[in-house]
């Protein structure tokens, strides 16, 4: 709050004490394997929506294929939710049953 005295031309400002900002919690976006969604579609989604390189996208796709589930990326809640909705819409448009979920990142 600024205070000004009658014959004084200087202004004194008071600043609120700085609050430490907490980092928002992060969530893992998980891809789940199925027997119908093509490997090419999964790689394309990883590249286009999750901005993975070709190499990383293929590695993640293979991990999901052989292990049943894999992490596409780690994001804040809103970003994770948006990415899931984007992929689900693309999967539906392409008649793919690709399933995604998210869970809090531990640590």
Swiss-Prot record:
Q: Name one GO biological process term.
A: protein catabolic process
Gene name? Answer: clpS
Question: What's this chain's function?
Answer: Involved in the modulation of the specificity of the ClpAP-mediated ATP-dependent protein degradation.
Give the matching SUPFAM superfamilies.
Answer: ClpS-like
Positions of the region Disordered? 1-20
What protein is this chain from?
A: ATP-dependent Clp protease adapter protein ClpS
Its quaternary structure?
Answer: Binds to the N-terminal domain of the chaperone ClpA.
* UniProt record similarity statement: Belongs to the ClpS family.
